[in-house]
Amino acid sequence: MRRGSIIGYDLNENTCQISYYDEKSDEPQTFEYAQGQSLIPLKLGYIKEQWVYGKEAELLEQKNPSCVVSDLFGKAVQRKKVRIGSKVHDAVWLLAKFVGLTLEDFEDIRFITFSTPYTNIDMSKMLKGIGRHLGVDKENIYVQDYKEGFCHYMFYQPKELWQYESAMFFCDGQTIRAYMLRRMNVANGQNRDMFVTVDEV
């Protein structure tokens, strides 16, 4: 089992990536679910009364596509019913199953933050429900979009970086997105409060 009571769970249409922080270490770590691989394909399969995910699900999909569901995130957001083999499942339940399988190595999760390309009230409720299903207290489950996550990341960087515009790029093999963090000028130049904006460009 892996220690990591604080989990960051990056979830998009095609992959997920897990970061974790253990109070005994200085820096967050990125979880490698295979040698040198931290991006987990967002696919879930069921064969011979066993669930498989990620690369194993991709291999199963090549042999038996009807036993694997892809675009799991999109289907869950749309609250679809999905057939795997001979059974029909709720896509939200399948996404919860996927998240649970990917986090089996962590023994004591006390905080979890889900990061997604965009958020809305329904998605936030869905992901918070999945967090509670994992046994995390509801007040310790957070949902943020990539813009907010970028802000949080930059706030903990050296302040010298804040005098420049900063960019974050996202690429999933099909699309590239760029986000710019800009410091805003306040009307009263003597105000010490700092305001920033993050725009997709």
How would you describe each model-predicted region?
Residues 1, 93-106, 149-161:
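Phosphate/ATP-binding catalytic cores across multiple sugar-kinase/actin-like superfamilies
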Residues 1-81, 132, 140-152, 187-191:
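Early-domain small/polar-rich strand-loop-helix modules and first-structured segments
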Residues 2, 8-15, 162-177, 181-185:
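A short acidic Gly-Thr/Ser loop motif
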Residues 20, 124-128, 152-157, 179-182:
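Short acidic, glycine/serine/threonine-rich loops at helix termini
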Residues 51-53, 175-176, 180-201:
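Phosphate-binding glycine-rich/basic clefts of nucleotide- and phosphate-handling proteins
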Residues 76-108, 125, 130, 198-201:
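Glycine/Thr-rich phosphate-binding loops that ligate phosphate moieties of nucleotide
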Residues 107-118:
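Short glycine-rich phosphate-binding loop at a beta-alpha junction
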Residues 130-135, 139, 145-166, 172:
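Hydrophobic, small-residue-rich alpha-helical packing segments that form membrane-like cores
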